[in-house]
């Protein structure tokens, strides 16, 4: 309520037969002193992509940034991409606005979507960069870029997002009243004093830009769309990194997206990685990595992978600032006959949590979806990031006082192939902290259900093991997925419960259900985790098939504690 960073919004679900992908969840608002959470990515849609979630606002007295907006989901056949989410606002006194999410692409005659607007900063801090507009690869117009946030007292205005082909660039924000450079594409000022201020700053910047390739004060330039150019680095003192340009379009294989530029040394947000270009008949381009922050600031989100026969992998999220700031989320994998893998979340700084892993890309009905990216590791005192669908959760920081490892992502679903195994929960801190829960197995319409991921182990002294993820149920004659094992506790704590096995389908009378996961063991004082129940056979166990074996309960502590109960069959 007071100091904790807000939670990350959930990823919107993909749409197969329906029209629109699910919208990403909004990032949570920070506590009184906490940073805002990142908005979740929109799900890909058969016609229209889901909108990215808005970034959460930081707490009123926070020294952290507003959360970044989520990336809009892609349209796969005939519609429009989903709009990027708006960046959250920073706290009252210090912190930068969150970056707007990139607009989703359209793979057909529809238009790409608009990028989200950048958030407002505190009295000292940069306005958030606007998100890049999404491209259209089938003859439609590219989406416009999002507007940059406006500086207040000291800090730069956010740069407007770059519009994709035929899409307009977003309007840049103006710099702070005392000190700060206007963002790229900001309108000309009608104030003589402001114009004089900008001229003086540009004169000071010129030798630094010429000799080092980055200004003293100001934002890095955005990479040109369609070239895969990297975004420029923010100013030596303060400034946001530029967004990477989208990868090349029109070749057999799509080009890689450009990396986001690094944030300024004192404060500044890393630029968002450019999305990978779509491949006409080959591989989708890899999304660009998000730019890293240095001292105070958030890492940029990784770019989405391009669509293709094999979807491109999403880019990795940028690392948070060494002292304060949120780590960037990994980019989503591109859609294809085989979906691309999501990018890994960035690592947290001293007090920051790891970034969320990106979701895997949608696979065709006969192919497999991509695996989600791993959550980033927490900083020295931070919690691990949540894994994308099927990705492992990040480990908590070594000296975290009670922060948990990140939860493993649920396994990706498939129409015909087996469901993806759920991600492993991240480990707690070295001495304190509980393990993250394992992710649930991915559902399959006609293949075997995915197994649940194992729960993460707790810290050595105090903490409970993470619960194992449940195995996914299967339909038809396929087999349910096995439940994940529970994590081991610390010296004082409870073992994690094993996950339940998945059931078989109604017509699968002679196929057994999935195995229940084994409960995690306690160490000195604490109870062992309960074993998971075995999955039912076909027709809820009434059609002659055998249920899955149950999981054994974990051992209790050596000094005090009961063994966990065995699961039911």
Question: Where are the regions a protein language model picked out?
Answer:
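Long, compositionally biased tandem-repeat segments
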Residues: 1-569
